[in-house]
Amino acid sequence: MSVKLACYVTASVTVATLMVCFMTMSTIYSEVDGFREKLDTEMNVFRQSTNGLWKDIVVIGRSSKRVRRQYEETNATPTPHADGSPSAPPGQPPAVPPVFNQPKTPNGANGNGPTCNCNADNKCPAGPSGPKGVPGVPGLDGVPGLDGVPGVGADDIAPQRESVGCFTCPQGPVGPPGALGRPGPRGLPGPRGQNGNPGRDGQPGHPGEQGSSGQIGKIGEPGPPGEKGRDAEHPIGRPGPKGPRGDQGPTGPAGQNGLHGPPGEPGTVGPEGPSGKQGRQGPDGTQGETGPDGRPGKDAEYCQCPDKSPPSEAVNANRGYRNI
């Protein structure tokens, strides 16, 4: 049901889009036609204006037949010296200043103002340009021109339009990026897509961690006794050659302490060591026993007895002998 609805909606949108396109094309065609008519009208007005200007130019050209003034240098103005005389190159005659004929009446009877009577034989070089003159009096209106000759009848020719082909302008430089526009309206949901192809099997994963040991199962029933096997042959071979000596094994653990051995023989007497420091003074010992009597001593020297002295000096009477 959803696929049919989507088809109907798509068809209706397509028809509406085509109608809008046709209306837009008709509008553009009408605008182009109006622009063409406006351009033709402006071209007709421009053609009439140019025809009128051309007639005015022809009339002015016929009426402006003025006699040219016969002089070679129109802007010849001699440069005066300090004394007021005009300058002239050496070896040439001085220039003759122009003589203006003054009008007979104050306002000029002839209406043309003063006239210039220049010397035609003057060969002086032209002087610097003079100042700009006063604008002249506007001239009289020209005589109306003659009527033109009637034109020859033209043949009936269909107007040919100028065919201008389209031309392609060179691509200009890339402009700066525009501002971010507003998000457009949400479009219609599209038809349901087809089922994708089934994916391929992935690579096997890494082995997981070892699980915990399960409970011990029940002991199975003993199986039936098997058939008797064949007698095996057990040949005894000769011993092989002695192999190479192996590497030294690691150091074994320390053994138990052994028994005390017998005392050894006394060694040789070593050299006398240095004298030690004097030790601290020990405590006084106990008083010893009285010793035996000593031997008789030597005879003492006889001293002269002192004189008799008063009783105060009798104290020193026992000092008459000295021991040797």
Curated annotation (Swiss-Prot):
<feature type="region of interest" description="Disordered">
    <location>
        <begin position="129"/>
        <end position="324"/>
    </location>
</feature>
<dbReference type="Pfam" id="PF01484">
    <property type="entry name" value="Col_cuticle_N"/>
</dbReference>
<keyword id="KW-0677">Repeat</keyword>
<keyword id="KW-1015">Disulfide bond</keyword>
<feature type="compositionally biased region" description="Basic and acidic residues">
    <location>
        <begin position="227"/>
        <end position="236"/>
    </location>
</feature>
<comment type="subunit">
    <text>Collagen polypeptide chains are complexed within the cuticle by disulfide bonds and other types of covalent cross-links.</text>
</comment>
<dbReference type="InterPro" id="IPR002486">
    <property type="entry name" value="Col_cuticle_N"/>
</dbReference>
<feature type="compositionally biased region" description="Low complexity">
    <location>
        <begin position="177"/>
        <end position="201"/>
    </location>
</feature>
<feature type="region of interest" description="Disordered">
    <location>
        <begin position="68"/>
        <end position="108"/>
    </location>
</feature>
<keyword id="KW-0176">Collagen</keyword>
<feature type="region of interest" description="Triple-helical region">
    <location>
        <begin position="237"/>
        <end position="299"/>
    </location>
</feature>
<keyword id="KW-0193">Cuticle</keyword>
<feature type="compositionally biased region" description="Low complexity">
    <location>
        <begin position="129"/>
        <end position="156"/>
    </location>
</feature>
<dbReference type="GO" id="GO:0005581">
    <property type="term" value="C:collagen trimer"/>
</dbReference>
<comment type="similarity">
    <text>Belongs to the cuticular collagen family.</text>
</comment>
<dbReference type="GO" id="GO:0042329">
    <property type="term" value="F:structural constituent of collagen and cuticulin-based cuticle"/>
</dbReference>
<feature type="compositionally biased region" description="Pro residues">
    <location>
        <begin position="87"/>
        <end position="97"/>
    </location>
</feature>
<protein>
    <recommendedName>
        <fullName>Cuticle collagen sqt-1</fullName>
    </recommendedName>
</protein>
<comment type="function">
    <text>Nematode cuticles are composed largely of collagen-like proteins. The cuticle functions both as an exoskeleton and as a barrier to protect the worm from its environment. This is a collagen critical for organismal morphogenesis. Mutations in sqt-1 can lengthen, shorten, or helically twist the entire animal.</text>
</comment>
<dbReference type="GO" id="GO:0040002">
    <property type="term" value="P:collagen and cuticulin-based cuticle development"/>
</dbReference>
<dbReference type="GO" id="GO:0042338">
    <property type="term" value="P:cuticle development involved in collagen and cuticulin-based cuticle molting cycle"/>
</dbReference>
<feature type="region of interest" description="Triple-helical region">
    <location>
        <begin position="127"/>
        <end position="153"/>
    </location>
</feature>
<feature type="region of interest" description="Triple-helical region">
    <location>
        <begin position="171"/>
        <end position="231"/>
    </location>
</feature>
